A protein has these predicted regions:
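N-terminal intrinsically disordered, low-complexity segments enriched in P/E/S/T
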Residues: 1-35, 39, 43, 50-133
Length: 133
């Protein structure tokens, strides 16, 4: 009999901004670490791959995102603009013009929201079956 696929649940009611989202990811997708995961999308991408105490590297699993519509709103344009403004403060000087363009787009409601970026990162992982509830 095939082994049942592991299910990990993120709950949109547990966060309303990017910082709280990272806390939820750490609570639900890591275990036994004596350090905190990075608070950035690259670290999130790494956690999705596994090896942080909840699922093994490249193990197939279902990621159930409860209250996803709330998260879609919470991680919409306002949070996206904040995210890009912070990125502008720390980006390499050669990237400033690109980031400024991203910020202008976000302020005009074009480009990708944080929600869309996060969903895109998840969908890059073939071992993840994403369920939005």
């Amino acid at each position: 009999m095939p082994e049942k696929m592991k299910t990990i649940e993120l709950n949109g009611n547990n966060f309303s901004n990017l910082s709280e989202f990272y806390n939820e990811v750490e609570r639900k997708m890591t275990s036994g670490l004596n350090w905190k995961i990075g608070r950035n999308l690259d670290a999130f991408n790494d956690v999705l791959s596994g090896g942080f105490g909840i699922h093994n590297v490249d193990e197939n699993y279902q990621l159930n995102w409860k209250n996803a519509e709330k998260s879609k709103l919470d991680l919409g344009w306002t949070q996206t603009i904040d995210f890009i403004e912070n990125k502008l403060k720390t980006c390499h000087p050669t990237n400033i013009e690109f980031v400024k363009k991203d910020l202008e787009d976000a302020k005009n409601g074009t480009g990708e929201t944080l929600w869309e970026l996060i969903i895109g990162i998840i969908k890059e992982h073939n071992q993840i079956e994403l369920k939005l509830n």
